[in-house]
Curated annotation (Swiss-Prot):
Disulfide bonds: none annotated. Binds to the 23S rRNA. A zinc finger (C4-type) spans 11-74. One of its GO terms (cellular component) is ribosome. It comes from Thermoplasma acidophilum (strain ATCC 25905 / DSM 1728 / JCM 9062 / NBRC 15155 / AMRC-C165). This is Large ribosomal subunit protein eL42.
Length: 93
């Protein structure tokens, strides 16, 4: 899927349609010091298997693409619902 770098859409902060810059949101590296990660490391260490059962459902065919739309007037960002696509590209329009 190809998406233009700039799109006209409604800004809830300006309360009107304005030009927005499109950015793709990427997942950052998970912190090793969070409580859940420390607990997970403690449970999986030593003898014994994985603490949770293996997921038996099917694999989804595609990943959801997370976008950030930044308003060119007020510079506030909105996050539209994720789009499913195998390929995603931001192009000059």
């Amino acid at each position: 899927m190809k998406m233009p770098k700039k799109i006209m859409t409604y800004c809830p902060y300006c309360k009107k349609h304005t030009s927005h810059s499109v950015e793709r949101v990427r997942k950052r590296k998970a912190s090793e010091l969070k409580a859940g990660q420390r607990r997970f490391r403690r449970v999986t260490s030593g003898y014994g298997g994985f603490p949770r059962p293996k997921f038996e459902g099917r694999e989804k065919p595609t990943k959801r693409i997370a976008l950030r739309l930044v308003c060119d007037e007020c510079h506030k960002a909105i996050t539209p619902p994720g789009i499913r696509a195998k390929k995603f590209e931001i192009v000059e329009a």
